[in-house]
Design a protein with these regions (language model features):
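Transmembrane beta-strands of outer-membrane beta-barrel pores
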Residues: 113-119, 154-160, 214-218, 260-262, ...
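Repeated loop/turn-to-beta-strand initiation elements of outer-membrane beta-barrel proteins
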Residues: 107, 144-149, 204-208, 262-266, ...
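Outer-membrane beta-barrel "beta-signal"
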Residues: 413, 447-467
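Detector for outer-membrane/organellar transmembrane beta-barrel domains
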Residues: 260, 264-268, 295-400, 411
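Residues that define the transmembrane beta-barrel architecture of outer-membrane proteins
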Residues: 105, 127-135, 188-194, 248-254, ...
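Surface-exposed coil loops of outer-membrane beta-barrel proteins
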Residues: 161-295
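Residue-level signature of outer-membrane beta-barrel architecture
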Residues: 139-143, 200, 257-260, 296-298, ...
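Membrane-embedded beta-strand positions of outer-membrane beta-barrel proteins
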Residues: 109-111, 150-152, 210-212, 256, ...
Length: 467
């Protein structure tokens, strides 16, 4: 895929993004994000924000777009394009959003934000008030024989997370100004995604899709943690981020894929270097890495994937080191009256192609929504750590060689409850606590049982039917 002219991709996507921004500048009047059957007269009447003339003027293709908001098949789930990159979640997974029609365009808006205070024990722990957040405008329409989707994703974390980090005990793999970030997670870039997607149906059960992104998420790993339904109530990152989904913000991404019934195969080319510490700009780089992903969706409530990638020079501190990454995940979602239960299991492995050293991570997370306004969740992790943690936030010594050291465990449990809402914005107050299991080599630094506590306010864009 490296033969595709990089400059042309950038120009095309910038034009697409500008068009999407202009369209999304119109004031939306939200409609239901989950119509049961957009083709029925009853369902048409149940879509607020759309006039009778709008509904009667909708063609079959536009009605199909409406049906994709409540997908019944893997093909519809893919064309929904509500997760990160081109990843898929179970068909039954809820997707809070605002949505409206503007001429031939369906306009959507997703957003999730936390304002939280975190406090951690141990001499390496930290205390901080900060905000993690993202928002995603989308526009879809029929174009030629297929469907065009324009999508942007943005974060204000460069402003709401100061000093290049927020406290996260045992986190590693991050870098700022030539120094490792130890026990902290860096903010996301302001530009998380600028992408155009095009899908073509080839018969009733087959779909061809393409994805072009100045900044985006290649076909590697599960849905990235900020956008994963099972992690939606958890305000902080995962310890296994660099083994599982750290490529979710990559530069110059090109993905092609084919779906047949319940099976999908994809391949991506992208620039392997992770974003630098300059969080407001758009990084550049040639396509030098590749990945492939197999997705299987054996029913409404299940989704699984296996993926493999070769990544060129991802880490700024080790520019001569290329990496191999493998991930596998299984996601389950079960809707029920006044609630929903969603769970994800993830395995990730990163192997250095210089010395064949490996780091594995394992994650199990689950979120239960019950009695409409209540959420309880857990995240259990077992993550490999390297000797870089022993150095802390200091320049690496001359001749330093990174090597696997031990595993750490993180056990997180949380609860929040939604309270009075203003139109199209759900608010919740919550807290979570994390207890850590520490490998013997790290106990002299961290102690044997450090803990962390977070108290937060969560804000989310919703339609009235998401309540």
């Amino acid at each position: 895929m490296a033969f595709i002219p990089q400059l042309s991709i950038r120009r095309v996507l910038l034009v697409q993004f500008m068009a999407s921004s202009l369209l999304l500048g119109q004031q939306p009047q939200p409609i239901s994000s989950t119509p049961e059957n957009a083709k029925s007269p009853a369902a048409r009447k149940s879509m607020p924000g759309m006039s009778d003339d709008q509904m009667s003027g909708m063609g079959s293709g536009m009605m199909e777009l409406m049906q994709q908001m409540h997908p019944k098949s893997l093909l519809q789930q893919i064309q929904h394009h509500a997760s990160s990159g081109t990843s898929a979640e179970p068909n039954s997974t809820p997707t809070p959003m605002l949505m409206t029609m503007k001429g031939e365009w369906m306009l959507m808006f997703h957003a999730n934000a936390f304002i939280l205070d975190t406090q951690q024990s141990s001499q390496r722990g930290g205390d901080k008030l900060f905000s993690t957040n993202w928002f995603m405008p989308m526009a879809q329409r029929e174009l030629g024989p297929g469907q065009l989707t324009l999508r942007g994703m943005f974060s204000l974390e460069p402003a709401t997370i100061t000093s290049e980090r927020y406290p996260l005990l045992f986190q590693q793999g991050e870098t700022a100004y030539g120094v490792p970030i130890a026990d902290g997670q860096h903010p996301h870039d302001f530009f998380m995604e600028i992408a155009g997607l095009y899908d073509i149906r080839v018969g009733e059960h087959r779909l061809l899709n393409s994805y072009f992104a100045l900044i985006g998420d290649p076909a590697i790993g599960p849905t990235a943690y900020p956008h994963r339904a099972s992690a939606f109530e958890n305000p902080v990152g995962t310890l296994g981020h660099h083994q599982e989904d750290s490529t979710h913000i990559a530069n110059d991404v090109v993905t092609v894929g084919m779906t047949h019934r319940i099976v999908r195969i994809e391949a991506s080319g992208f620039h392997g270097r992770e974003p630098d510490e300059h969080r407001w700009n758009i990084d550049q780089g040639k396509i030098d890495s590749w990945s492939t992903r197999l997705t299987l969706q054996p029913g409404q409530n299940w989704s699984g994937q296996y993926s493999y990638a070769r990544i060129t020079s991802p880490e700024a501190l080790f520019p001569a080191e290329d990496q191999e990454r493998m991930t596998a995940s299984l996601m389950y979602n079960k809707p029920f009256s006044n609630g929903n239960w969603v769970s994800t299991a993830v395995w990730g492995r990163t192997r250095s192609l210089s010395d064949s050293s490996k780091e594995n991570s394992y994650l199990l997370e689950s979120t239960l929504r019950f009695a409409k306004q209540n959420y309880a969740w857990t995240r259990l992790e077992n993550a490999g750590r390297s000797n870089e943690l022993l150095i802390g936030e200091h320049p690496l010594p001359p001749g330093f060689s990174e090597a696997p050291l031990t595993h750490v465990q993180a056990y997180t449990f949380g609860y929040d409850r939604e309270f009075g809402r203003i139109p199209h914005l759900a608010s919740a107050l919550g807290a979570q606590v994390t207890a850590y299991g520490v490998g013997q080599p790290l106990q002299p630094i961290y102690g044997s049982n450090p803990v962390g506590v977070s108290i937060f306010l969560r804000l989310r864009a919703i339609s009235k039917d998401d309540r």
